């Protein structure tokens, strides 16, 4: 029997306060998170932003106990998935590959090779594909395969996204139903889906299917919820965690909550739709910041649906995905990371940016001026980036 490795991809998170700065640096150094036309600026900008945001982020992590629970939860998900697959007759071993903190992808790949795995199923713990989540992890795996002949020779099957998988949809609907039934007015409880946002340009210029998959997923969950509770409920989909002055997917969670507050919403059931584990964005951003905002805006009862974590039907759904991947047609890394052929990933060709040799010189000069302005604002603690909330 072939030995199968299940490679679970996730974001990662700082486990201690002192890890916050390095974690943020790794995050912002990824060109899929901050897209710049000149890659030479990526690391200096990542250092600058992580330095400026570190203190605020540390306070957020202190409010949830001093660190992220993401690694602990993801490793528990991995153990339970491994156990269930072995019960189903699959000789599976699970591995966790975090993108921006330990255990890093390189570590998971080293363990896979050391264990003599015959075949790998790559399963992102992101139900919805995005350039900045699954896409970034897929491209990191592509980079590692190009550098390692042994890893490159290992058969890899990828699961690109699974937002419409019945096991996931049903699990989400069941957990939402728990909070709907606890509401004072079950038929009018307002379901509020809060998804992690991405810049609008990712969707409109780079062809990211994220928004389409999120919207389709919310519709599927609402239909399943209706079969469980026996009635339809009003719902809203909004996007959280916006950073910086650029336009992100709308409506923004903050603005949508304020609007529902003005409407004197009695029962609000908040659903972290793009998160399968408790972490900083559920425990601090939703449970503390958004709860306070909603209450101040006029929402009477704020209920948050728990993350899937190790909910048994959810783990069973993940096992179904793995088995289907092993039995179905192979989806390789290139196919999993692919975007529509009509668009290009950044950076585009020079002529599409209007560049020539002369303009590149000026672009470089302007970039240095801009970076100098960043440093000046870092030293002074004042400036336009502080004013708009980026720093």
Swiss-Prot record:
It comes from the Bacteria. GO terms for biological process: heme biosynthetic process. One of its GO terms (molecular function) is metal ion binding. It is found in: Cytoplasm. Pfam families: Ferrochelatase (PF00762). Fe cation binds at residues 196, 281. The keyword Iron applies. Its main location: cytoplasm. Its EC number is 4.98.1.1. It catalyses: heme b + 2 H(+) = protoporphyrin IX + Fe(2+). Pathway: Porphyrin-containing compound metabolism; protoheme biosynthesis; protoheme from protoporphyrin-IX: step 1/1. It is an enzyme of class 4 (lyase). InterPro entries: Ferrochelatase (IPR001015), Ferrochelatase_AS (IPR019772), Ferrochelatase_C (IPR033644), Ferrochelatase_N (IPR033659). Keywords: Cytoplasm, Heme biosynthesis, Iron, Lyase, Metal-binding, Porphyrin biosynthesis. Belongs to the ferrochelatase family. Catalyzes the ferrous insertion into protoporphyrin IX. This is Ferrochelatase. The gene is hemH.
């Amino acid at each position: 029997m072939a030995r199968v490795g299940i490679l679970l991809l996730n974001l990662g998170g700082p486990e201690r306060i002192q890890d916050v700065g390095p974690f943020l640096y790794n995050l912002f150094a990824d060109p899929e998170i901050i897209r710049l036309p000149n890659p030479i600026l990526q690391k200096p900008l990542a250092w600058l932003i992580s330095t400026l945001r570190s203190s605020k982020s540390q306070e957020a992590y202190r409010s949830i106990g001093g660190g992220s629970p993401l690694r602990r939860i993801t490793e528990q998900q991995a153990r339970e998935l491994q156990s269930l697959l072995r019960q189903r007759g699959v000789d599976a071993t699970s591995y966790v590959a975090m993108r921006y903190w330990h255990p890093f992808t390189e570590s998971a790949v080293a363990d896979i090779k050391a264990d003599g795995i015959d075949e790998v199923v790559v399963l992102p713990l992101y139900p919805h594909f995005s350039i900045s989540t699954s896409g970034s992890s897929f491209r990191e795996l592509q980079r590692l395969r190009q550098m390692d002949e042994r890893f490159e020779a290992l058969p890899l099957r990828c699961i690109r996204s699974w937002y419409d998988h019945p096991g996931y949809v049903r699990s989400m609907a069941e957990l939402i139903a728990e909070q709907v039934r606890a509401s004072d007015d079950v038929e009018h409880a307002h379901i509020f889906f809060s998804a992690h946002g991405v810049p609008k340009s990712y969707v409109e210029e780079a062809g990211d299917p994220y928004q389409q998959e999120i919207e389709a997923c919310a519709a599927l969950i609402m239909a399943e919820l209706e079969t469980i509770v026996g009635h339809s409920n009003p719902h809203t989909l909004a996007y959280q965690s916006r950073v910086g002055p650029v336009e992100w997917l709308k409506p923004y969670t903050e603005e949508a909550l304020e609007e529902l507050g003005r409407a004197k919403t009695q029962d609000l059931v908040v659903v972290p739709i793009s998160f399968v584990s408790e972490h900083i964005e559920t425990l601090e951003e939703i449970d503390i910041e958004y709860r306070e905002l909603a209450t101040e805006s006029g929402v009477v009862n704020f209920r948050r649906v728990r993350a899937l974590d190790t909910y048994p039907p959810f783990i069973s759904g993940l096992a179904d995905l793995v088995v289907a991947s092993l039995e179905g047609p192979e989806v390789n890394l290139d196919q999993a990371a692919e975007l529509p052929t009509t668009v290009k990933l950044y950076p585009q060709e020079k002529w599409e940016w209007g560049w020539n040799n002369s303009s590149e010189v000026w672009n470089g000069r302007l970039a240095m001026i801009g970076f100098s302005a960043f440093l000046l604002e870092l030293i002074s603690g004042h400036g336009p980036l502080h004013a708009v909330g980026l720093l």
